[in-house]
């Protein structure tokens, strides 16, 4: 089975923690049944060299915004811009199979807004969301979704 490839950016460690938990969960599922895919991940940061992706992948991105309410009075993405630039590099967007977003529900309409904007910008599905570091149920739910797709 081909591994699930994930590109992610993590600012405060929540996304990194979730991807780590997802990777561990995948190992357990694969140990139970070798047809269950493993997870391979690559962290994108401001220090990353842009590369041409060669395999389909999913993107995990948190939301950090400055000002505006995200709907009618503007939005300014903070700290995650490099991920958007990486997806847009060369033909990388062609291999993106969807976006998973995270954030804090306290921000209402801004919750997962970066992921939703990337999905629209790159014409790929917004697949799922989880809050902050996610829960075990989130890990299971998102693994099943990515493994099926």
Regions found by a protein language model. Name each.
Residues 1-76, 80-81:
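N-terminal beta1-alpha1-beta2 submodule of the flavodoxin-like/Rossmannoid cofactor-binding fold
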Residues 55-149:
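FMN-binding flavodoxin-like domain, especially the glycine-rich phosphate-binding loop
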